[in-house]
């Protein structure tokens, strides 16, 4: 394994990804970040909250920080994109978080296996079905303040999976975490794409595929796609630049993409349990 890594490690830059706030000596939603990473979302953990990052993911363990509500408010006022979990929401919603948004996490649950996706939170334009029902917490929210980007569908009802709120110059996204973290893998690809987009707002690389495909990004335009699936899988890669190509760092193969406005879109095949290493050129 190490011999194969030696073939490309020198061509990688410094790792990038959505900043994760993991305070020292904290716990809560333990190991959730591992599951999020398996959804194709690159993460970079930090023990302190750094306002230099534009995208910041905060899970329940951050409730150990007694100033977390104030810190989130300051991040949003400065124009940052903050993503929190339903676990953190429930832990801090009675500690002043209602001054930021009126979304609340209740004790009620819902089983969902149908998902609806909205581009802007106004109408649902995609419906997808998961392989099994997923048990999620139910959120309460006011429609004039919050917008559902992904929703789980019930019987004549719907439940937020990804909800967006605006505050100051920034955006707050709340991600619904199933009772069983492993059920995140059953969120269908159509639901995972807007979740990845929320974590990677204005980032250079975004993938569209099923779960158990991980993405590792670097500051020199290189990235790794790693599959943990037992079968081949197509991955759509969007590079937020026009007129770029990809080169496979290991094989030297060049890949041409499809121009779509100021973006370039590539479709690549990943073999079972394997990886591909690319760089923009």
Residue map of PLM features:
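Short boundary motifs at domain starts and secondary-structure transition points
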Residues: 5-17, 47-49, 163-164, 214-216
């Amino acid at each position: 394994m190490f011999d194969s890594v030696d073939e490309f490690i020198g061509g990688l830059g410094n790792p990038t990804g959505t900043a994760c706030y993991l305070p020292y000596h904290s716990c809560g939603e333990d190991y959730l970040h591992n599951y999020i990473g398996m959804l194709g979302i690159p993460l970079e953990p930090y023990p302190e909250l750094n306002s230099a990052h534009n995208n910041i993911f905060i899970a329940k363990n951050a409730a150990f920080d007694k100033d977390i509500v104030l810190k989130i408010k300051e991040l949003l006022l400065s124009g940052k994109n903050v993503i929190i979990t339903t676990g953190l929401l429930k832990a801090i919603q009675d500690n002043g978080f209602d001054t930021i948004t009126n979304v609340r996490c209740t004790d009620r649950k819902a089983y969902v296996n149908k998902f609806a996706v909205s581009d802007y939170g106004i109408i649902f334009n995609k419906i997808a079905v998961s392989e099994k029902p997923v048990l999620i917490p139910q959120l309460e929210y006011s429609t004039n303040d919050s917008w559902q980007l992904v929703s789980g569908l019930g019987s004549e009802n719907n439940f937020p999976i990804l909800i967006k709120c605006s505050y100051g110059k920034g955006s707050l996204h709340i991600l619904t975490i199933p009772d069983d973290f492993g059920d995140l893998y059953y969120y269908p690809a159509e639901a995972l794409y807007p979740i990845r987009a929320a974590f990677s707002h204005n980032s250079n690389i975004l993938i569209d595929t099923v779960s158990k495909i991980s993405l590792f990004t670097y500051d020199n335009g290189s990235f790794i796609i790693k599959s943990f699936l037992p079968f081949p899988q197509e991955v759509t890669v969007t590079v937020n630049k026009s007129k770029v190509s990809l080169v496979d760092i290991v094989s030297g193969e060049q890949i041409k993409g499809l121009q779509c406005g100021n973006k370039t879109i590539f479709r690549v095949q990943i073999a079972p349990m394997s990886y591909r290493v690319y760089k923009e050129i």
